[in-house]
Amino acid sequence: DMADVLKSEQLLARDWFRSLSVAGKTFSAPGAPYKLSRTPCTHLSASEAVGASTDLMLDDSFPWPIHENIVTKKCETQETNKSNGPLAGLRVIEVTANWAGPIAGRHFADLGADVIKIELDTKPATRALAYVPADIWPDHYHRSGYFNKLNRNKRAICLNLATTKGRSLFLKLIESVDVVLENNAARVMKQLGLSY
């Protein structure tokens, strides 16, 4: 029940809600998803009507709020050198689903490990979510921001671990890895004949 959310002791203690007024009505709205002490979130005012701020948002001269503690500089593009990371030389096979497993694999990869994600072509998982923008071409399988966020810096291979060939290739791959990362339901790996 949303009324319970508005009474949440945790959210109230964190001063999470903000007050908004729209069309003469004032109500509580969600605040920022996280708080940073040196660079707090700056909320824009609520619009009185749908589309009321469109011209303003599209105006290149709009003075977007920048906190005084932010130091701005031109970012230079550089190639990531994974061999410099603290986990360089570590090899990880990732057989994960949803969010927690892929984000753990991403942390390994971001820190320099060679992470190989096992994907199933019949279940593209988060690859199928939200194309940005709405068109699905070309290379629609590369267009999910959610998938890209969770799987950056990884390599991938499609293997169906339910088949003899897929399982055989997987077992060959894990001979050369240091870590097998998986977060499936407890029965899944065992049913695939890949239990510990």
Q: Residues of each region from the PLM?
A:
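A glycine-rich dinucleotide-binding beta-alpha-beta segment and adjacent secondary-structure elements
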Residues: D1-L44
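N-terminal helix-loop segment corresponding to the beta1-alpha1 unit
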Residues: L20, S45, A49, S53-Y196
